[in-house]
Design a protein with these regions (language model features):
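Extended, beta-strand-rich, solvent-exposed assembly scaffolds of outer structural proteins
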Residues: 1-69, 75, 107-284
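Short, cationic low-complexity segments
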Residues: 74-106, 288
């Protein structure tokens, strides 16, 4: 039986504790951080796999712990640290914003719609799809709306954000053929522009009132910066004019879809902020 299996694990296996949860699943855990590895077992419904441990930080004086990538985005001089560096240690970015705990994922949102069937819970509250949403509701701002629909239940506010840095080749030949460049499908005629400042002005004129993406110029590099304060997925395409030569997130990490033939896309990030400053518990609902 399941109960006998759990008892055998607890009796015979070191560094693993087994129990049956409220939904009837067998849960394996430890408080040492050792990896938990499984061999395939058809009888038990287990596939061969290994699960690495997590690192837990505790403040000795009970003050909040701040975790940041060492990037220009976070106020450091250069992009020596990236979100991917946090991911290798199992950390998300953790900051105090106006005295409240704010946690930002170390990876961008995926391209799947978040539904109740995914079992995502925040502070024990199931996050479900909203009326009017569909399989195309996959942007960070879509998922932010779903989370915030239940803020009064879980006590957390979600915000989206997305920002990329684009290297622009302003050589004359490239600019002359950049009349039908697009940003999120909106045509932006850049063929008459001579400077990145002109490009910024042209993009903002074309996108104004249509979409939450704003262009600016990075002060220390002169590169083009595209920002969505709601977390929209940002897609660019120079339609073969060779106008765009490199694209990254502002921390220097690779965008979702790498630049190819002048086209690239970058999905947004989500930050969760606790309204009362307490910890935020996230469950993904996935059972193996």
């Amino acid at each position: 039986t399941k109960e006998e299996f759990v008892a055998a694990v607890n009796s015979e296996i070191t560094n693993v504790d087994a129990r049956i949860d409220a939904d009837g699943y067998v849960v394996f855990s430890n408080d040492t951080g050792y990896a938990i590895s499984f061999a395939s077992s058809t009888e038990l419904g287990i596939t061969a796999d290994a699960y690495g441990g997590f690192v837990k930080l505790e403040s000795l004086d009970n003050t909040p712990i701040t975790i940041q990538a060492g990037s220009k985005e976070n106020g450091y001089g250069a992009n020596n640290g990236r979100r991917s560096d946090l991911a290798t240690m199992g950390f998300n970015e953790s900051n105090l914003v106006n005295g409240k705990l704010a946690v930002t994922g170390n990876v961008y949102v995926d391209d799947s719609q978040l539904t109740g069937a995914d079992g995502l819970k925040i502070n024990g509250v199931l996050i479900t799809e909203l009326d009017g949403q569909s399989s195309t509701s996959v942007n960070a701002n879509d998922k932010v709306a779903q989370i915030n629909d239940k803020t009064d239940q879980h006590g957390v506010v979600a915000t989206g954000f997305n920002q990329i840095v684009v290297t622009v080749d302003m050589s004359n030949g490239n600019m002359q053929t950049a009349s039908d460049s697009t940003i999120n499908g909106i045509t932006v005629d850049l063929s008459g522009d001579a400077t990145v400042t002109n490009v910024v002005e042209g993009i903002n004129a074309a996108l104004a009132g249509k979409i939450d993406i704003v262009a600016s110029m990075e002060a220390d590099t002169g590169k083009l910066v595209l920002t969505s304060n709601s977390g929209l997925t940002i897609s660019i395409d120079d339609t073969g004019s060779s106008l765009y030569t490199a694209v990254t997130y502002t921390d220097g990490s690779a965008v979702t879809t790498a630049l190819s033939s002048g086209a690239a896309s970058a999905r947004g990030y989500i930050t969760l902020t606790s309204l009362d400053g307490s910890s935020i518990k996230i469950e993904d609902g996935k059972q193996d």
